[in-house]
Amino acid sequence: MSQVQSGILPEHCRAAIWIEANVKGDVNALREASKIFVDKVATFQAKFPDAKLGAVVAFGNTVWRQLSGGEGAEELKDFPVYGKGLAPSTQYDVLIHILSARHEVNFSVAQAAMAAFGDAIEVKEEIHGFRWVEERDLSGFVDGTENPAGEETRREVAVIKDGVDAGGSYVFVQRWEHNLKQLNRMSVPDQEMMIGRTKEANEEIDGDERPVTSHLSRVDLKEDGKGLKIVRQSLPYGTASGTNGLYFCAYCARLYNTEQQLLSMFGDTDGKRDAMLRFTKPVTGGYYFAPSLERIQAL
């Protein structure tokens, strides 16, 4: 069995760092840097076993085609604009995702990543996420209630089983900026109908009682009776005095599942948009492929 990268399956991490970057010059330097980075991660995992450290290095479409010789990751593509511009594309070449129970360990690993990749990349965005009270989003609603639980279930959803891509996963990242003042002008019942869950108790509102534009209705999708699931590794980010929101991060064995949710949220299926756009907006968007550890070492 191919070994999946260690940042894909963990649950309930306390903190994370995401780094998106473009390649500078020859991709051969990226090959070697990626190998060095995964070795560094293993060293930190051995040094800080209590941190439950995980990490991922993933690649955008153009760079992955160069690294892989065009083999595999057939669904991978550049992130397009959705909803006639409501969801912008900020596609980059490389994604580094670090998560654990200890922010200081994450930061040390991020420093090691910068040393490993060096001049091979140009960092375009770096976001530090944190687990908030009761695993809630900054909106006050519990985040990720429908997230698959347990390693076996999460592996089934997130990890490609067979073929040249075995052990790999498609990654989607999208940073959302909240307007909490706008949210707090709404009554709690209105907020609950917008999300599709009660705020305090986190109970699902029945489908025939909540609007079709509620967030839950837009993303709880089924085909042939089977849910289009993704494994989420999202966390709040930001400052109390400035910009804050949710850094959405999801892994899936099929990019299809992720894209169907996006098409539904931004009105590209039936013209109806996710009601949570009343108080929050996406400002970035990227698709990546995270190969197995064996495939990274064979680049």
List PLM regions with ranges.
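Long, histidine/aromatic-enriched segments associated with O2/redox biology
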Residues: 1-299
